[in-house]
Amino acid sequence: MDRINGLSDDIICHILSLLSFKEATSTSVLSMRWRYLFAFRPNLCLDDQEVGGGDSFIDFVDRVLVVTGNFPIRRISIKCRMSIDTGHVTRWMVDVLEHGVSYLDIDIISEDDIGFVPLEIFTCKTLVELKLARGFYAMVPDYVSLPSLKTLFLSSIWFCNRDCCPLGRLLSACPVLEELTIIGGCWQHIEFCRTVSSSTLKKLTITSSFHYEYWGITIDTPSLAYLEYSDLVPRHFPFVNLESLVEAKLALDLCSDSNPTNLIKGLRNVEVLELSSGYTSQILYDFREAIPVLSKLFRLSIKSNSRHYYIWNLLPILLEKSPKLETLVIKV
């Protein structure tokens, strides 16, 4: 213990950052010097499963953020599985932004209401990775600017803008964005086409976020290498640019007037393709005239369900369109 006490606070904080947060907080009983050192780790993971939920969790997070003072926080994760007031969550987010945080992960169940993402998040110059889950409303301002953001994860986020496509506005303010994940939520007001446009985006995942009233999705991502789309097909894809696509995983579903034609045409450069449901095989067969020559495809995986007979109708078409195919995996 004497040898450890001889180390500087910076080194001790680095050592504590290698422990779980529960283990790190247990060191606070060692001495007065150690009482708050756990709070000065550059990486903070505040989880109600480790420190208790409800009011005790709120008090604990408040205490940690007060103790850190002006000390920089590089990465912080706040997770709470017990419902808490959204006012606390908003206050915490604003607080950590003032610490120059680079990685922010918020996963909290709110009480009866859904909180708003604070406007300060949309002008944070230090954020590199942002993850928001469990439901927030968001109003993207016209002055949004996230110059350092590379990873954006949105789960059950409901955009409220009615004068524009808020996701399009948000992405246009992220000049170095590389990874985008959207799960559930609502992208935009009914009058606007969904737009995913980014010249830097390399990985895109869209899951269970479609609503019947939406008309179309524009995907303009010339640098995209990985696409995972597990959702309803909209009425149309007005524009699709997937020139650099290497791998695609599709689990498509149809409504009465869905049209995936341009999405299917956009797969022409894909090298690895996974069709993750029988409905996907059915959709590709129904729109088989849109299937391009897959000149680079070397691995094809097809999963099925009760609609497995569509696989055998679709398979000869895909084989004919894939001159360089090396591996075929069929899971029935």
Curated annotation (Swiss-Prot):
Domain F-box: 2-49
Xref: Pfam families: F-box, LRR_At5g56370
Designated name of the protein: F-box protein At4g22280
Originating species: Arabidopsis thaliana
Species classification: Eukaryota, Viridiplantae, Streptophyta, Embryophyta, Tracheophyta
